Amino acid sequence: MKKVIFLSMLLVFCMLAYGQTYRIEGTVIDKTSRKPLEFVNVLVVGLGIGSSTDAEGHFSVEQVPPGIYRLQASMLGYKTVFTSEYRVNHRTPHIQIEMEEEGTQLEGVTVTASPFQKVAESPVSLRVIGLQEIEKAPGANRDISRVVQNYPGVAFSPIGYRNDLIVRGGGPSENRFYLDGVEIPNINHFSTQGASGGPVGLIDADLIRNVKFYSGAFPANRGNALSSVLDFSLRDGDMEHNSLKATLGASEVALTSNGHLGDKTSYLVSVRQSYLQMLFKVLGLPLLPAYTDASFKLKTRFDARNELTLLGLGGIDRMKLNFDIEGEDAEYILGYLPKINQETFTLGGVYRHYAGPHVQSVTLSHSYLNNRNLKYHDNDESSEDNLTLRLRSVEQETKLRMENTSTWNLWKLNAGVELNYSQYSNTTYQRVFTDEVQIFDYRTNLDIFRWGLFASMDYSAPDERFTASLGVRTDGNNYNDKMKELWRQLSPRLSVSYRLIDRLFLSGHMGLYYQLPPYTALGFKGNDGSYLNRNLDYISVSQESVGLSWQPNENMEISAEGFYKFYRDMPLSVSDGIPLACKGNDYGVIGNERLISTAEGRSYGIEMMFKWLLVQRLNLSSSLTIFKSEFRDGKEGDYVPSAWDNRFIFNVSGTYNFPKNWSVGMKISCIGGSLYTPYDVEKSSLVEAWNAQGKAYYDYDRYNTERLPAFGQLDIRVDKMFYWKKCMFGVYLDIQNITASKLRQPDVLMSTGQIENPTAPLSERRYVMKSIKQESGTLLPALGITFEY
């Protein structure tokens, strides 16, 4: 009887949810004058329903089924606009659409609009990631760093181990991130200091509207990047309603709120707490991570021409070691992994003034990172003699950017200035073994003042058949005399695009980009208190790319792009002869060593992508990247494969929406085998060497001479949504590596703890060594639940 009652209630529950429809409301304004536009046709893309705006620019579309949609706005004399994606439910936000007047229109010429965004400054190497992909990408668990890995040129960490962004053969330290124009230093918990990767994303997907992902052709107002820029656009709070959403994700629980404070200010706020520590303990893993994060956005529109956005993002990370488990694998990891504690936050504000064809903005922000690592030999904290690493490092940056954008008919000019004051402090005790044991014991207090200028001019032909963009940027700082000279870091760039025939575009870009080495390198000291890396230069990369893109219809795009990157003045490690760019894909810190700017590198290849979008039905994409990544020591050295030289990356990802709000997604990922370096058995077996770092040393004379097999995995995701008049409930099942594919890794060399020659002098004593077979690859299921009221 209980089963009958339960099934009856479930049936009624589903029937009430099915067939629910909603209303979409918003306003359309002139982008320049900020005045409302009347008689604009607004359509829900893919549904064929819509409405027109009234004298106040207001529109309302009734009877819209729940889901994720774009809007299309069109009007004679204005460029047709496709909006970002919006979720339509009981709390669909008020949507504001900005339309731009068309320039001088040639008689008889029709300009065809498309949802696939192309901009004059970045006609190649730019992808816009929408809400559908962020919410439902299989295997990503709503983590934007993993969503990006579906795109051409981006390598991925098998079995979802880490979120390092490896773009077009570049290192994980070569990326920059922006939230609504505010730069943030990293987007991951437990981030590797000196790089950008980590195991879990820091940004709650519930706050994201879309992401612009640049794998090249960076805008002039986005500096200090060599491989990629991720430009996040956050949602605005709802000016009509207040709502609350709870989410149980793969690794955390989250609570988000969205609404308004008065009639001029909207807000978004999110708080998340992980339960990984409990989960990892149950699974018997040797590390116990826990994290908390919070983020917010406040936006105030004072009037039609002035607005202020305040936002914040912060995280607290704690990683303990689990000594309650046994086994050789656990023994190995516990032997070298330090305890890690991190706190990070960014607070920023953007003031924007609209003055007709001119828009001025002022962006002010402050970022903070406090990173602490602690390690004792054999994890024995009973004596300070066992201490091998104690690090406390703090990075702080205060940034000011002022810019103006002016539009005149077919031309657009953007220009501005940046100022940056950075403080870096470090207290380090570290035991290191080269040919003998060395102790680095130093304190750093480094202040760096940075400045930059940028400008770009865009042109678009009246029929939009041809576009061009010319930009320049230059940066400097007071770290050393060479870096002060702006002309040394002059960074020109040029982009062009030409429509060969209807919907077929040929585009190209060339540019020179610069990036400052990490603070960990700039602040590294010797025991005598002197800065050992004072002669470092800015790292530079010249990039060239050319691409073809074809849009058979408004729902489909096929593209191919070739790229070439050449690096100069790459920091090279004095101790092992490896560029800093080849490090940073593991926990800890990189850059805190003696470096010289003598390495060069190159990466080149071809990317192909197919994308097919059918609103509320299908989101399908496929990408293939074939590339090579190499470096050398100086102009006369031989090229050696870099750590990121996987040779190929292949992805197919799709999500299909079934009736009654069911959706199923699948992703197939394949990547070429990673290179690895054999161990230096002689050095690793020395007692003093092993005790210094707790793991084996590589034989860098044979750097990257071995390659692992290629790897592939299949991820599946199933979603079910329930919609009612005043609330929404959703559940999803995400399964990574559903076929349990095995990832082959090099055998690990480790000490048995037994000394084979105990009577020898200490410097000659050796451990008896053993090898542990390394192979991972398990099915990783995750259940997620969301409820919004």
Question: What is each model feature region?
Answer:
Residues 276, 307-354, 360, 368-395, ...:
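Flexible loop and strand-edge segments within Gram-negative outer membrane beta-barrel domains
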Residues 188, 324-329, 425-432, 502-544, ...:
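Surface-exposed extracellular loop regions of Gram-negative outer-membrane beta-barrel proteins
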Residues 460-466, 564-566, 587-678:
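Gram-negative outer-membrane beta-barrel transporters
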Residues 568, 620, 670-694, 709-713, ...:
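C-terminal beta-signal and adjacent terminal beta-strands/loops
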Residues 391-393, 397-403, 441-454, 533, ...:
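Outer membrane beta-barrel strand-and-loop segments of large Gram-negative receptors
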Residues 18-108, 119:
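Periplasm-facing N-terminal accessory domains of Gram-negative outer-membrane beta-barrel systems
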Residues 79, 85-87, 112, 116-218, ...:
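Periplasmic N-terminal accessory/gating domains of Gram-negative outer-membrane beta-barrel systems
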Residues 249-273, 285-319, 338-361, 366, ...:
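Transmembrane beta-barrel wall of Gram-negative outer-membrane proteins
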